[in-house]
Amino acid sequence: MSGRRRAYPQPQYSAAAPSGISSPPVSQFQQQQQQPGQPGQPQAGFQGAYGAAAGVPAYGADQLLGQFQQMSVGNGAAVGTPQQQFQQPQYPQAQYQQTQQQQQQAPQVNPQLSYDPYQPQPQAGIYGQGMGGIPPAAGVGAGAQPVASYGAYGQASNLAGGVQLNALYTTDLSRDLPPPIAELSYQPPPITLADTATIIPGSKTANASSDYFRSTLNVVPNNSSLLKKSKLPLALVVKPYNALKIPDENVPVTCDTVISRCRRCRGYINPFITLAENGRRWRCNFCNLLNDIPSAFEYDEISGQVKNKFDRVELNHSVVEFIAPKEYMARAPQPIVYVFIIDVSVHAVSSGLTGTITRTILESLDRIPNENKTARVAFIGVDTNLHYFRFNEGLDGTEIMVVADIDEPFLPSPGGLLVNLDENREAIEKLLYDFPSFFESTANQGFALGPALKAGHKLISNVGGKLVCFAATLPNIGEGKLSVRDEASVAGKPKEAKALLTPADSFYKSFAVNCNSSQVTVDLFLTSAAYQDVATLANLPRFTAGQTHFYPAWTSNKYEDVAKLSKEVSDHLSQDIALEAVLRVRGSTGFRMSSFYGNFFNRSSDLCSFPTFPRDQSYLIEMSIEETINKPVVYFQAAVLHSTSFGERRIRVMNLALPTSSKLVDVYASADQLAITNYFTHKAIEKALSSSLPEAREYLISRVVDILNIYRKELVAGNVSGASPLQISTNLRMLPLLLFCLTKNLAFRSDRVPSDHRAAALNNLGSLPIPQLIKSIYPTVYSLHNMPDSCGLPGVKEESEEDGNDDNDEQGVEVDVVLPEPINDSKSSWENYGLYLIDNGSELFLWVSGNVVPGLIQDVFGTENLYEIPTGKTELPEYSIEESEFNYRVRQIIGKVREQPDSIIWKNLYVVVGASSNEPIEISQQRDLMALRMWASSCLVEDKTGSEPSYRDFLTSLKSKVSQ
């Protein structure tokens, strides 16, 4: 096997159709040369850059709530172009057995008109000067003179507090084909504030990063009528943590326990307050009340040194964390506690779940957060009985205690069941090592999950913690017993959702609410090829701030299954979770937090309770405008009061300031299409569970129609007769695509889907952070056979202007593996001899086209026979870079795509061989292969899939709906 780089046949370039090259499409806007005097619209926008111990009294969330309320926490453009043909040495054509194809030279493109959808064109912004023959939107106006520009986002159409807001640029969806998917990785429209809006003028860290805190609208309507008219939602997306481990975040912490809050609204001091009375007092930006500046801001009583209050991190940074004094503690911070509830029925033992889980826990003991050596653990095995394990002090072994009374489960011992991990390490290790042997000859088919949950809750209700459940069997005995539902009679019918996706037993929700009151979270890891009623069981994590992890048809006989489950469980246990947490979001006067979405429980109208706060989920808060807003800027603040796993009480505060406007044009010009997609996803889930799946799909499509209608009526200049009905602002042009693709997601699609799979998909969509959500809706596809030579190898960090003053000068230092530019989710972007990697957020598919050249599969798989490639769930053979550079690069890309610092998900790889004209009949008739091809192809969401139309057909249907 040669280690040299090969050059695989490149697709022909065609200006009329998409090619396999990872190049962005050129729309009619870019194809036409701008002519002075020609009616047109500038195409501009923002630049894409990512950039229970004995004697301890019970203390629950109700007491914590009372204490907390007393505190009143508040009211890309692709780098490739069509000219880029990667010049590499060519293999002899005979070796490839391919018909030689003549390469068509790419047409010359005016450099000024190269693909950059958010780069304003020279002279753009004046009616009659532009491209495409589409007049500017209202608010830009015929003959409007350019005033100024804000970065790359275009000209201002309005002033907010003396600051020019983002301009509106219109595009035609029917011309933006294929859709410019690079924009899915762009940052939201910039938030334009005056330098004087912050106490530190011009501060670049005063407003929260969209990774933590973002709004669906980056210009807020100043009254409810305008918001209703816009057909756009007003909501906040909150993700307080962006890494699984505390050291991986760069959030400043105030350590002096001095916390300054408004006396009236209880808002935290932040970068947007103003000073009064010679700096002795600060005016709250939420309620306008004057408050005293703490003396500790200017004088350190311990050291006797004078301090500069303007150096305080809470005045300089939008996201900060306070170490809280005792006044913020309802009780002393509790230790981190895990109760492992393990299925030991015959199904769990025979599938290997019991052995895999105990081995994984054993290997992960060092990863459990235990900095102060206070972590506690307990183990309960479950079949038709409850098997407790008592640790005897001073003894290496454990005693098994069996409780057969599952109707009234009790703790068989007053002590030794919940023990300190550090002090009992040897005994715990021995138990986990021996655990599978205790049940290896079982024939017990029962699984009393409900009684086990109640027993675990009783064990830790006075300290709180986590119940981590591993199940391979449907709960079939005791309280919470479930039965298999009749899917065949309702699948594909309007009543499917109510019959299959709503809870079958109220026990699980009521138990979850009780757990929340006791600061207990439930996490589920479900592994079975048979029905498990995910829709019912998912209530446990949903109301306790946990998560449901679903592994259909899992078996320990498959290495890849074991690897995925083990890695995800291990990463789950290693999270630096917060304990006994509450979240409250406040806004400026005139706003009300009306609805809350995510995995938690609302204990009051605006207080979200989290027994433990995970670091891999996000939350959405819908807002309503209660009165007219007369200020140019409004403010929002999210605060998470919590205890760390190492025993500190902390408050994480996030701040966001947004301009307001009375003009619809400004609202649309700064709308965040990804955050809006998140909002509509939550509403569609709500609609599906309360009504039906067809109504949820119709809800999504009708939202697109409403937005296009209002845009056409209000924002297309003069509502030009005969104008395309599919016009929308450039910053929202991915929204119709995303909502259309959401209807084809496993959670909502009209095709028949097993109810457990659909319920798991709905559950995941309701808690995913935005980047993972978008990938689940619109999978990322990479073309590997023609990727640039730099891809799959470490890149080099180049110093940018923003980095110029940084102390950390890493210019010329190797950094992360370079990935190819994504291509559109459509077979029209593929070649029949290509190699493609599909990432849908949960799995990876490596698609080997049926006419792939032998040299390519030799380099990747070590064989020239296409049908000798191992397909399905597998891993690639590992060759060194000297043995096969291409194999090495492909594996590096797969490894990079699997990296997710804020998620525990490990994506299995599925190898799929595409069909070809000379495919052997015995291959083409393999049911597993056909099913695998259909599964992978369903990720190509722009194409027609099953009974679902293509995106082009969807746009065609929209024209008639919008024109009506």
UniProtKB/Swiss-Prot annotation:
It comes from the Eukaryota. It is a peripheral membrane protein. The keyword Plastid does not apply. Gene3D superfamilies: beta-sandwich domain of Sec23/24 (2.60.40.1670), Sec23/Sec24 helical domain (1.20.120.730), Severin (3.40.20.10), von Willebrand factor, type A domain (3.40.50.410), Zn-finger domain of Sec23/24 (2.30.30.380). InterPro entries: ADF-H/Gelsolin-like_dom_sf, Gelsolin-like_dom, Gelsolin-like_dom_sf, Sec23/24_helical_dom, Sec23/24_helical_dom_sf, Sec23/24_trunk_dom, Sec23_24_beta_S, SEC23_SEC24_subfamily. Residues 799-812 have a biased composition (Acidic residues). Coiled coil: none annotated. Residues 1-48, 80-111, 792-812 are annotated as: Disordered. It is found in: Cytoplasm; Cytoplasmic vesicle, COPII-coated vesicle membrane; Endoplasmic reticulum membrane; Golgi apparatus membrane. The keyword Protein transport applies. One of its GO terms (cellular component) is endoplasmic reticulum membrane. It holds the Pfam family Sec23_trunk. One of its GO terms (molecular function) is zinc ion binding. Its main location: cytoplasm. Residues 8-48, 81-108 have a biased composition (Low complexity). One of its GO terms (biological process) is COPII-coated vesicle cargo loading. Keywords: Cytoplasm, Cytoplasmic vesicle, Endoplasmic reticulum, ER-Golgi transport, Golgi apparatus, Membrane, Metal-binding, Protein transport, Transport, Zinc. Residues 262-287 are annotated as: Zinc finger-like. Zn(2+) binds at C262, C265, C284, C287. Component of the coat protein complex II (COPII) which promotes the formation of transport vesicles from the endoplasmic reticulum (ER). The coat has two main functions, the physical deformation of the endoplasmic reticulum membrane into vesicles and the selection of cargo molecules. Belongs to the SEC23/SEC24 family. SEC24 subfamily. The COPII coat is composed of at least 5 proteins: the SEC23/24 complex, the SEC13/31 complex, and the protein SAR1. Golgi apparatus membrane; Peripheral membrane protein; Cytoplasmic side. This is Protein transport protein SEC24. It comes from Lodderomyces elongisporus (strain ATCC 11503 / CBS 2605 / JCM 1781 / NBRC 1676 / NRRL YB-4239). The gene is SEC24.
